[in-house]
Amino acid sequence: MVELLGIIRIRGWAKAPWYINETLNMLRLRYNFNTMVYPKTSQILGMLNKVSPYITWGEIDPDTLKLLIINRLETVKGDKVSDSYVKEVLKIENIDAMVKQLYEGKIYLHKLDEYFKLPIRLHPPRGGFKGSVKRPYKNKGEFGYRGDKINELMRRMV
């Protein structure tokens, strides 16, 4: 079973050094409130640590991933993702089976460019951020690693 990381960009590009913007572009997080789902690897973790003042991330659970796919993921044509679309293009029975295969490591969401519009665009969080986006999560802020609390934030942003 593969651990999946949900990564959300929470700060803009102005006054960010070029190497931060370049790394965020590699992660496909070009704009505020864009999110991507990646498997937990040492390469990804190194990139996340480099750009941590501009993003927040943590381990995403299957329920939140399913909610994200159903409500915010779009097809290439701009339509919402449905069970019939997943069955037609990916040859997978439904969205539940797709989430299961994502967690088994058989398919990777970030490599499905020809079927979905990536990155996934989110709303700002309902109720606003609970802390400052200029402080780390551990010190009553918002940026950086937050573990499984990323699910709570993503549910407020869907």
From Swiss-Prot:
**Which is one GO molecular function term here?**
structural constituent of ribosome
UniProt keyword list: Ribonucleoprotein, Ribosomal protein
**Keyword Ribonucleoprotein part of the UniProt annotation:** yes
* CDD domains the record matches: Ribosomal_L7_archeal_euk
A single Pfam family, by name? Ribosomal_L30
| Top-level lineage group | Archaea
Record-level GO cellular component terms: cytosolic large ribosomal subunit
The answer to whether UniProt assigns keyword Ribosomal protein to this entry is: yes
Q: Which GO terms describe its biological process?
A: maturation of LSU-rRNA from tricistronic rRNA transcript (SSU-rRNA, 5.8S rRNA, LSU-rRNA); translation
**Gene3D superfamilies with a match to the protein in the record:** 1.10.15.30, Ribosomal protein L30, ferredoxin-like fold domain (3.30.1390.20)
Q: What InterPro entries does this protein map onto?
A: Ribo_uL30_ferredoxin-like_sf, Ribosomal_uL30, Ribosomal_uL30_arc, Ribosomal_uL30_euk_arc, Ribosomal_uL30_ferredoxin-like
**Oligomeric and partner information:** Part of the 50S ribosomal subunit.
Name the PANTHER family for this protein: 60S RIBOSOMAL PROTEIN L7, LARGE RIBOSOMAL SUBUNIT PROTEIN UL30
Q: Which family does it belong to?
A: Belongs to the universal ribosomal protein uL30 family.
Q: What is the name of this protein?
A: Large ribosomal subunit protein uL30
**Which source organism?**
Saccharolobus solfataricus (strain ATCC 35092 / DSM 1617 / JCM 11322 / P2) (Sulfolobus solfataricus)
